[in-house]
């Protein structure tokens, strides 16, 4: 799902190239671990989610003095089953709308400070001004993190709203149309009975990953993956 305008009206852009500029030493990094799910059909998608249920997007805010790595995490599986586990459990139980589990909002969200336990598949760097740095820092510190969901309030949503504060709009949404039934582990299983669960739209690490790579190829921001992986954390 495309964005209408790539940059905010007040974005800090080079007058000649139209690309983002900033003050020396100030940068915003978007770190993305894509799930690389198979979106070919519903059965393939369900199987790939079962194999690789984890994906994550997070950020680094950098100034000449320090570097803050942070993100929004949740779906920890302590009070309730994790999203993918809850769906599969409802499928096994014969629930008429197992996919409806993804419409829940978990209450275990939290601010992640520091490096997560898995490396990113891609890191994108964008220069920002000192003013943008301060704006983003204050937003991150004041933002609420307790709510965490698939359809809203997920890790990618937090990255997207932070990027918007830096003056750039990123492509990140996906819309999935589920069939009423699909094959799961060799058997046809009910996905939904109530048609309100037919379409699932959410912010996707996979979609964001493709957009960030395209931006780097076109000279908007840059690929900082090797730089990040070489850091001594």
What are these regions (language model features)?
Residues 2-16, 133-233:
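Activation targets extended, charge/polar-rich intrinsically disordered C-terminal tails
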Residues 2-117:
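Glycine-rich catalytic cores of cysteine/serine-nucleophile enzymes that process amide/ester linkages
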Residues 11, 98-100, 122, 129, ...:
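Intrinsically disordered, low-complexity segments enriched in proline/serine/threonine
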Residues 45-48, 118-126, 141-150:
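Second-shell loop/turn segments in exported
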Residues 110-138:
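A structural motif
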């Amino acid at each position: 799902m495309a964005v209408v305008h790539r940059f905010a009206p007040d974005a800090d852009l080079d007058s000649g190239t139209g690309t983002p500029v900033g003050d020396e030493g100030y940068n915003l990094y978007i770190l993305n671990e894509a799930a690389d799910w198979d979106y070919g059909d519903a059965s393939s998608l369900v199987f790939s989610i079962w194999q690789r249920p984890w994906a994550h997007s997070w950020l680094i805010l950098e100034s000449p003095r320090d570097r803050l790595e942070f993100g929004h995490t949740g779906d920890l599986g302590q009070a309730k089953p994790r999203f993918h586990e809850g769906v599969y459990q409802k499928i096994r139980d014969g629930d008429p709308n197992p996919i409806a589990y993804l419409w829940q909002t978990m209450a275990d969200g939290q601010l992640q400070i520091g490096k997560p336990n898995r490396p990113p598949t891609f890191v994108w760097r964008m220069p920002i001004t000192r003013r943008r740095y301060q704006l983003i820092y204050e937003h991150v510190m004041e933002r609420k993190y307790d709510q965490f969901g698939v359809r809203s309030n997920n890790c990618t949503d937090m990255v997207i709203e932070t990027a918007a504060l830096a003056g750039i709009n990123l492509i990140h949404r996906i819309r999935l149309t589920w069939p009423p039934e699909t094959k799961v582990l060799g058997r046809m299983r009910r996905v939904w009975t109530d048609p309100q669960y037919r379409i699932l739209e959410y912010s996707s690490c996979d979609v964001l990953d493709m957009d960030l790579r395209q931006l780097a190829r076109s000279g908007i921001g840059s690929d900082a993956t090797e730089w990040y992986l070489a850091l001594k954390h």
